[in-house]
Amino acid sequence: MSAVVIGDPRDELVTPGSPGQFGQGGDATAHASMLGGIPVADLPHHELLLGQRSGAIGSVHSWELVTAVDGPGTRMTTFLAGCPLRCLYCHNPDTMNANRGLPVRADDLLARIKRYRSIFRATGGGITLSGGEVLQQPAFARRILRGAKKLGIHTAIDTSGFLGRNADDAMLADVDLVLLDVKAGDEATYQRVTGRRLQPTLDFGRRLDALGTETWIRFVLVPGLTDDAATVEKVADYAASLSCVSRVEVLPFHQMGRDKWAELGLDYQLDDTEPPSAELVESTRTIFRSRGLTTY
């Protein structure tokens, strides 16, 4: 894996220093980002709200140009602000609150995307909309996906599927690949991990299957939380039931986001949890492979 971080939230996409009104706080009121971030002081509140509702303006946390992480090839991954889940292992807790994003015009983001078309073509890459939760801003996501497809660029979304109802068929027609994060295979574990219900994710995956949308299943392996063989087998059975699934990624838990939780004054409940052993990771992948799933 190689990555070139371009959208550092400290400069090009300034992450507000404190939550509040959308895009307010820190340097966000004083500086525009290289994606055309809009200083809130320069935009009447009603215009900001109208822009959000129409999808002309989105709340963006950051972006990066990265290879072999969020889909095939080199990709421009844009992290939208706001998420309804509260995953215990989230390594970007600063994306949970939509108010911590910077207002960015869809047209400005598309202009940035267009600049990388030659890289995308050369590497078989494209764009990935992530978060946060991309489907918390469906109007903005819809505009970006439609614009990218008009440019001939491969598109992907990274989503929990919890807000799958926000994605209409027209939006999904502009999505080439869905990275579907299935946090657990049983309701009790899923609620413990995310604070939300599992069923919306399962329903969204089945809808993707009906539409024939290529899907990669992502599963985070956390010792003592999601590593129980029974719950892993349920995730594997679910993935195997979807003909649209072309790949499964078992992602070992890490504590890279722990400092962010502390900075935000949030309780990080996995402070004493170690990453899974290589043996546990491999045995978990074997469960998926035993069902004929291409697994990494």
Where are these regions (language model features)?
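Solvent-exposed alpha-helices and their adjacent loops that cap or buttress functional pockets
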Residues: 52-53, 69-71, 121, 171-172
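Generic detector of short, locally flexible boundary/turn motifs and exposed helical patches
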Residues: 16-28, 40-46, 53-55, 75, ...
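Short glycine-enriched, charge-decorated loop/helix-capping segments at active-site entrances
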Residues: 94-98, 191-197, 265-273
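Auxiliary Fe-S-binding modules of radical SAM enzymes
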Residues: 1-67, 223-296
